Amino acid sequence: MHIVEGHIEAKSAKVAIVVSRFNSFVVESLLSGAIDTLKRFGQVSEDNITVVRVPGAFELPLAAKKVAASGKFDGIIALGAVIRGGTPHFDFVAGECNKGLAQVSLEFNTPVSFGVLTTDTIEQAIERSGTKAGNKGGEAALGLLEMVNVLNAIDKEL
């Protein structure tokens, strides 16, 4: 049996982090967690990390698509926070963001890690951005590092 796996270390990986400015009090913590994880666990050089800021989560897929189309990056991390309010706006933004980012990944054969919080409350968002429930930005970075490596391994081994 042949097993193909990805590892976390990716010293030469070029990573773009596409970040929503909306709900920045949460998203900046996600960004810090992602960058810290890329550097500490992936040993990615700061020179190989590019941050692209967009207004909100709805704009993340288009920016990620443009980044992927450039061919300059091994992977993309999308970070944002969509917090439920009193209208259906949450459902539209969260759903389209998710679908759009998945489409970018499949269209360009580039891993796009989903670090967009979709929570019912501000408290839940804060918990997931570095307090009680860990830092989902860091988790998204770990997932991206593994996917970059597993895709490279598939190319080499299969």
Curated annotation (Swiss-Prot):
Pathway field? Cofactor biosynthesis; riboflavin biosynthesis; riboflavin from 2-hydroxy-3-oxobutyl phosphate and 5-amino-6-(D-ribitylamino)uracil: step 1/2
**What organism is this sequence from?**
Shewanella amazonensis (strain ATCC BAA-1098 / SB2B)
Entry's Gene Ontology cellular component terms = cytosol; riboflavin synthase complex
Oligomeric state and interaction partners are given as: Forms an icosahedral capsid composed of 60 subunits, arranged as a dodecamer of pentamers.
Q: What is this protein called?
A: 6,7-dimethyl-8-ribityllumazine synthase
Q: Which residues form the active site?
A: H89 (proton donor)
Q: List the disulfide bonds.
A: none
Transmembrane feature ranges = none
Report the sequence similarity comment from the record: Belongs to the DMRL synthase family.
Protein keywords: Riboflavin biosynthesis, Transferase
Q: Tell me which EC number(s) this protein carries.
A: 2.5.1.78
